[in-house]
Design a protein with these regions (language model features):
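Accessory cap/linker subdomain of secreted extracellular hydrolases
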Residues: 179-272
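Short alpha-helix in the alpha/beta-hydrolase fold that links the catalytic acid
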Residues: 275, 289-299
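Conserved alpha/beta-hydrolase
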Residues: 94-116
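Catalytic active-site module of serine/aspartate enzymes centered on a nucleophile-bearing elbow/loop
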Residues: 316-346
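N-terminal cap/lid segment of alpha/beta-hydrolase-fold proteins
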Residues: 28-66
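Short beta-strand/loop motif that positions the catalytic acidic residue
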Residues: 273, 279-281, 285
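Short, surface-exposed "cap/lid" segments of acyl-processing enzymes
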Residues: 63-98
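Alpha/beta-hydrolase active-site loop
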Residues: 124-144
Length: 346
């Protein structure tokens, strides 16, 4: 029974964070707009070289005076909107509470094909087009006269936490937060992810090891040799029982998306970061492992000792929930760290 419950929880998490959910597919007339007690929302668009028109959400505190800090959110992997009319999940709870409680401006972007973003359908959009959009959104900060360009925080959630430095590039950032995230290669991440998935599904240790051996070859062909899963399975029909997703991609995104993630060198990106970094991991996260998250802090501190802080929260899952409730202590943890980072000498 315990194994069955674990498997159900794992499947639920995958459905929430790695595949498109109903929230992203609402028709425009049914969309609920956000409202905040302490902030107003402005709507805009940015573009990328693919011709996509990407919706941005900019919030400004109602009583803001002069230039203020800003939180730039980098979103997750799935085709879910970053627009939250309610605290419908842990990511939404964190976003909404930071907007209402920080006193900072914020900016978010919906990736191609999500929400009101136009152009390439999300299930066809690769990672490079998405990254271009995030970079355009980051550049758009310059147009808002109430934002202090010396006080920009990049907050990456799930997949977005690992790629934060790629979004800002050489532009000034006051600090990075990587929550429920990754700092290794996507190949390493997926092999560990498959082991966890199979174990929580109740497979025996022998079955898990045999499957992981096959997955090492499968993911080499898929991520590194850049073949599609369907083509691989035609070459290796003995692996058909292992594969649980599309012949053209995975978790609702095309194969090219993950092949481009694998091509990234996050070690190089993070070792160049010489500003405060906060890495947050929940001990109950079955999507991004401790090794995935800790890698970021380890890389930064090896290059710049003391710059990164790693915080592991007992019992917290990928959704920032403990016992199915949002971990409310996460908000003051982040806000206190931001205040400290603003007072840290460069």
């Amino acid at each position: 029974m315990a194994q069955a419950r674990l498997a159900a929880v794992y499947a639920a998490l995958l459905s929430l964070f790695l595949v498109p959910a109903a929230k992203s597919q609402q028709p425009e007339q049914a969309r609920q707009r956000e409202h905040f007690a302490n902030a107003d929302v402005q709507y805009d668009f940015v573009g990328n070289s693919r011709g996509d028109k990407l919706r941005t959400f900019v919030t400004k505190p109602k009583n803001a005076a002069g230039k203020i800090p800003v939180i730039f959110f980098v979103g997750w992997l799935s085709c879910d909107s970053v627009e939250y009319a309610t605290e419908s999940d842990g990511f939404g709870a964190l976003i909404r509470r930071l907007i209402d409680q920080s006193g900072y401006a914020t900016i978010r972007m919906d990736k191609p094909g999500v929400g009101e973003s136009q152009g390439t359908p999300c299930n066809k959009a690769d990672y490079q087009g998405e990254l271009e959009g995030y970079r355009a959104a980051f550049d758009s900060l310059k147009k808002y006269d109430f934002i202090d360009p010396q006080k920009i925080f990049v907050v990456g959630l799930s997949n977005g936490g690992g790629v934060g430095p790629l979004v800002s590039g050489s532009q000034h950032v006051a600090g990075f937060i990587a929550a429920s995230s990754w700092g290794r290669t996507w190949y390493e991440h997926m092999l560990e992810n498959e082991r966890v998935r199979l174990t929580t599904a109740g497979k025996s240790p022998a079955e898990v090891n045999d499957a992981v051996k096959a997955f090492t070859q499968f993911y080499n062909l898929y991520l590194i040799q850049r073949q599609k899963p369907g083509a691989i399975l035609r070459q290796h029909p003995e692996w058909k029982s292992l594969w649980y997703d599309s012949p053209d991609g995975q978790y609702g995104r095309p194969a090219s998306f993950y092949q481009q993630l694998q091509a990234l060198n996050l070690g190089q990106a993070w070792q160049q970061v010489d500003v405060p970094v906060l890495v947050i991991h929940g001990s109950a996260d079955t999507i991004m492992s401790r090794a995935d998250s800790f890698a970021i802090a380890e890389i930064v501190n090896q290059a710049h000792p003391g710059r990164a802080r790693y915080v592991e929260i007992p019992g917290m899952d990928h959704l920032f929930t403990v016992n199915m409730q949002f971990h409310s202590d996460l908000v003051p943890l982040i806000l206190d760290w931001m205040k400290e980072a603003l007072n840290t000498p460069r």
